[in-house]
């Protein structure tokens, strides 16, 4: 509530798995919750291993996994371009955030917080009319292949009312598209299948 991303402290909590959950809606729009559209935001709060020594070595000491950019002069542009696929123009580097999870994936979680704040600021203009935003900052995605969201799919949503089941899902995972620049929006799903094969 301090930054205005929810109406009240009751609108934000940790679920039993440890996912941070917050909701926003317009309680005065005259539409019952079970008739509203549900927009689901999801972003994860964990990151992969830092590999601090490797990054420090491969960037000639110009980047530290925890401290960010240590020196812009002599930054290993070729290495970074190879790792990231895209580098912004040099005159934009002062506006970048470097550090653990800044791109994967805390920047996305921050965008969810800002989106709900803006939606609440625009409630008088109808931004939330007939809509509930359910936002999640989930855990255990990097190291457990999506265990935080799977908790929702397996434990929260089955048998729940329509006020919980999403009509649309927005994943705030940074996608990027080196051909288009630093940002890109992807629609769809990469897909996944788990199968067990028994050979006799």
Question: What is each model feature region?
Answer:
Residues 40, 134, 198:
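Conserved beta-strand segments that form the floor/walls of ligand-binding pockets within enzyme
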Residues 188-198:
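Eukaryotic endomembrane system proteins
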């Amino acid at each position: 509530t301090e930054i205005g991303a929810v109406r009240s402290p009751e609108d934000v909590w940790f679920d039993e798995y440890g996912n941070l959950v917050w909701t926003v809606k317009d309680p005065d729009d005259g539409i019952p919750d079970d008739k509203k559209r549900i927009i689901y935001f999801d972003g994860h709060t964990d990151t992969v291993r830092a590999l601090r020594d490797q990054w420090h070595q491969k960037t000639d000491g110009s980047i530290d996994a925890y401290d960010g950019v240590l020196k812009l002069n002599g930054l290993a542009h070729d290495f970074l371009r190879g790792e990231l696929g895209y580098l912004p123009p040099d005159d934009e580097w002062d506006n970048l955030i470097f550090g653990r999870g800044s791109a994967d994936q805390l920047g996305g979680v921050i965008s969810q917080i800002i989106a709900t704040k803006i939606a609440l600021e625009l409630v008088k203009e109808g931004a939330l009319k007939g809509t509930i935003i359910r936002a999640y900052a989930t855990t255990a995605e990097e190291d457990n292949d999506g265990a935080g969201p799977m908790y929702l799919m397996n434990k929260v949503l089955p048998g729940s009312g329509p006020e919980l089941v999403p009509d649309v899902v927005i994943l705030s995972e940074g996608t990027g598209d080196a051909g288009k620049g630093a940002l890109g929006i992807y629609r769809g799903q990469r897909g996944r299948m788990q199968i067990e094969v028994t050979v006799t």
